[in-house]
Amino acid sequence: MNTISKLGIGTAMLIAAGTSSVWAASRVQVSLWDKGASTEMPMGLAYAAPGLDMTKATMGMKVSPGVVKAGKVTFKVKNDSKDTVHEMIVMFLADPKKPLPYIDAENRVDEDKAGDKGEVSELDPGKSGSLTVDLKAGKYLLICNVPGHYGAGMWAEFTVNP
């Protein structure tokens, strides 16, 4: 208490507030959406696909903010679908110009080869989940790897600055 009285309560509060924000993880809100299970799923909308036209996407991810600082990042994920299970996987893009490795027969990304950094898996409609990971600076891709969803455009770019 002597230290607080010497510094003044206002100064002590500023120091405490500054200290707590240094240790806090960046928080990212992720909404997983689609236009309904009865909507036809287009293909050819995977990241870095030639002639990519995202206006055809019937599902996707809304990410806010899309840029954070390196360190601990907490993703708060909500499946806003009314009838479809979705997930969110964090992938590091070693080369942002290259597509992720894909298993055609399974209609999904090869998570082991792609550099999976963590996931909130299989969220039922209306459900939420969270994931906290330590991310280094670079480009990342958030994807839903339920078969067919990634190829239908269910992904979002994400940047981590130094």
Question: Model-found features: residue ranges?
Answer:
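Bacterial N-terminal signal peptides that target proteins for export
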Residues: M1-I9
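Bacterial N-terminal signal peptides
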Residues: G8-G18
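Sec/Tat signal peptide C-region and signal peptidase I cleavage site
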Residues: T19-A24
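N-terminal edge beta-strand
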Residues: A25-K72
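Beta-strand cores of secreted/periplasmic/IMS beta-sandwich domains, seen most often
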Residues: S26-R27, V63-F92, G129-I143
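Extracellular/periplasmic metallocenter environments
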Residues: Q29, D34-G36, K82-D83, G118-P162
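Short solvent-exposed loop/turn micro-motifs enriched in small/polar/acidic residues
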Residues: T58-M59, V68, K113-A114, D124-G126, ...
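The feature marks short-to-medium sequence segments in extracytoplasmic or secretory-pathway proteins
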Residues: H86-E122
